[in-house]
Design a protein with these regions (language model features):
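A short acidic, glycine-rich active-site loop
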Residues: 52-64
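Short, hinge-like loop/turn segments at secondary-structure boundaries
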Residues: 50-54, 99-102
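Small/aliphatic-rich secondary-structure junction motif
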Residues: 3-49, 134-135, 154
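Gly/Ser-rich helix-loop-strand patches that form or flank binding pockets
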Residues: 100-155
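A generic structural signal for well-ordered alpha-helical segments
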Residues: 26, 73-74, 130-132
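Charged docking surfaces used in two-component/phosphorelay signaling
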Residues: 85-93
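A short helix-to-beta-strand connector/capping loop
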Residues: 75-82, 137
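General small-molecule cofactor/ligand-binding pocket signal
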Residues: 34-36, 82-86, 140-142
């Protein structure tokens, strides 16, 4: 099986740098991109019908987003990406996905720029180490402000 590069699809401005880098690395190494979208846990809706409708809408929006971004990943990597949707917190979802798929070999995150700091996922990985899903997993942290040309050169 080809090695897989895991990218967490979030709404941060630097996310696209991580996706571009992972896609180019996958192409240059014969690998594949895994795109993980994490949905928030059950909402505070008081009725189960409302909760179910909110969850259905969130999942539908995630599928549309993954399909749109997946086209870009496929164009850059040359292989169809794997789409995953999990519910809960991002760190827990990453651990679950990595534990379930031994072909995931690298986690690719993009660091935020400016006064915001590197971002919550990058900060958590730095603080707790790369022991993810019961195994050590290399983490590539891509500067969020890299240009397309710089990513091409590095990947």
């Amino acid at each position: 099986m080809p090695r897989k590069f895991l990218v967490v699809v979030d709404d941060s401005p630097e996310f696209e740098a991580a996706l571009r880098f992972a896609s180019r690395r996958a192409k240059s190494t014969g690998g594949r991109v895994v795109m993980l979208r994490v949905l928030p846990s059950d909402s505070d809706a008081h009725w189960s019908g409302a909760r179910e409708e909110i969850a259905r809408q969130q999942r539908q929006e995630a599928e549309v987003l993954l399909n749109r971004l997946g086209e870009e990943a496929m164009a850059r990597s040359g292989a169809a990406p794997v789409f995953l949707i999990e519910q809960g917190d991002a760190q827990g979802a990453i651990r679950k996905v990595v534990a379930a798929d031994p072909d995931i070999k690298i986690l690719v995150l993009a660091a935020g720029t400016g006064s915001r700091g590197p971002g919550p996922l990058v900060s958590a990985i730095i603080k707790h180490g790369a022991q993810i899903g019961g195994r050590k997993l290399p983490v590539t942290i891509v500067p969020g402000e890299l240009t397309e040309e710089e990513i091409e050169d590095l990947a």
